[in-house]
């Protein structure tokens, strides 16, 4: 079965070079093609990474809820959110829908979990 993916790209500010979004997208397209993934959606937005309350994240969640994707591809996990607790909550919500997060730079989520446990925080 071919993995269906949503490519997610984000820039923090509109005054950043617009081509950076295209560069992120193109790198993710190549990454997906090399692995034989089927790109179902490309989501690109400009906004702060401090919160998950963004249209692109809602679009991604909708695709997951409708079982249209198997994974979300990002160039770096920080493109999703800069807050590790919120990133783990997003990962949990996606996982319940059978959707994983795949980063071109590797997966720091286990380190995020260890940090949260060390701080005595529980993610529901």
Residue ranges and their predicted role:
Residues 1-124:
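Short, structured surface patches at the beginning of a domain
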